[in-house]
Amino acid sequence: MRIRSGDVSQPAEQQLLRDYFGYRAAAFPQAGGYTVSLPDPSQFDGARGVFLVVDDDSGVPVGCGGIRMLALDPARDGGAVRAEVKHVWLDPSTRGRGWAGELLDALEQSARALGATELVLDTHHTLEAAARLYARTGFVPTEPYNDNPNATRWYRKPLGDLGPGGSR
């Protein structure tokens, strides 16, 4: 498995996003439907965010995730520089291998490199495996920070200082 930089305007990345949105849309009808909102590629341009791709051992793209920096709102954020985790998805055939945790680690490292002091994300209550992953990796429930029509849960993770050697 390899995690690499991606470009949401490229065909392979667009296919991953179609797979992601298709998976979500299929799972959400019972929960009131799912609204597809394709990402603006400029959100992941390297200065304002990144988009990462997970390739399997054969080099086939099987997952993705992104980080986008959010506009500062001192009243809301209390001085935190927030980065939002977006579009985390792995093909169901790859699940259970720990790759989602590795992808989240890589996204966190990218957010730190962009100057973030806090990660936030939103998800849906039907995605229980995702909720367990987020809890296991240090995310805690928080108040809604956006008006995403697909979200029913919001999480945050402070990015405290790294200890000696770059670890916590």
Language-model features: where?
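C-terminal "cap" of GNAT-fold acetyltransferases
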Residues: 117-168
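Acetyl-CoA-dependent GNAT
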Residues: 3-86, 91-93, 104-106, 110, ...
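Loop/helix-junction capping segments adjacent to catalytic residues or to phosphate/diphosphate-binding pockets
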Residues: 11, 97, 128
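Active-site acidic-Proline motif in GNAT/NAT acetyltransferases
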Residues: 91-93, 97, 125
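Conserved G/P- and acidic residue-centered "switch" motifs that form tight phosphate/ATP-binding loops
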Residues: 98, 115
